[in-house]
Amino acid sequence: MSGAFETELRVAIDAARRAGAIQRELFEHLEHVTPKGRRDVVTEADYRSEAAIIGAIRATFPGDAIVAEESGGHGVSVEEAIDGPRGSAAVARAWFIDPLDGTVNFANGIPIFCAAIGFALEGRPVVGVLYDPSRDELLHAVRGRGAARNGHPFHVAPPRGLDECLLGVVHHRGFLRTVARLRPRVRAVRDLGSAALAIGYVGGSRLDGYIQPGGLSPWDLCAAGLIAEEGGATVSAYDGGPWFRYPAGPAARAGRARQPAHRSAALSALVAAPGIHAQLLALLRG
């Protein structure tokens, strides 16, 4: 491990493994599961994992901004960390943490979840780590240096026909018609229950693509999007635009203003191998 952002990568890997140890300890041994909104839950594993990750980062980078799913912004808001305060430059150094992506799976004893830790420099993701403790599998990427699984480089699958593709999707109510329209055009669709893992899997060719029209937060995307991109996938927003930028315009800003300060889930994703990405984008626009 050498080169730019070596220390950030080392800290992220160490933090993710600490969180993973907590999750292994508590998996199928939870005493309480607390509802969080209509579709989500939060557990002791989320809180303890997040505290462990933040502690590991603070020990080495005490001045960095942190945005975490459960505790929110530490010294910065979500929008400031990505887009900067009122349109000025983004925060120079910011970490985006989802301590346990796939909490519903975790709470129900389904071993599909991960810790996701991303680091962005002036609003641009440059380090990403996903750790799946159930498989002891670590995906990581550094911008410009490719992506790896447990230290072994990986890349997107070779080009193939859309009808051979396995797509990751999210089965939210507003997206069901689109999923139904896509289903006959591909081999199969799957909702893994962890957006971060699904996006990372595109970079490693386990999935050929992932589509989510909204409902994503920066901590879902920072690490996973970079890993997919460094694995050779094309990563964009659902409409083909930049993937780590909040939608612009008064309506988009008003919608985010109605969200709690650290829960602006206004991002989207379309991730696939380059040739497949273009076909999927055309289908979604059609």
PLM regions and their residue ranges:
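Oxyanion/phosphate-interacting regions
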Residues: 1-10, 14, 180-183, 200-286
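Residue-level signal for inorganic ion chemistry
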Residues: 19, 23, 46, 57, ...
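Short helix-loop capping/hinge motifs at secondary-structure junctions, enriched
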Residues: 146-149, 153-155, 174, 276-279
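Short loop->beta-strand "edge-of-pocket" segments that line small-molecule binding or catalytic clefts
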Residues: 155-174, 183-193
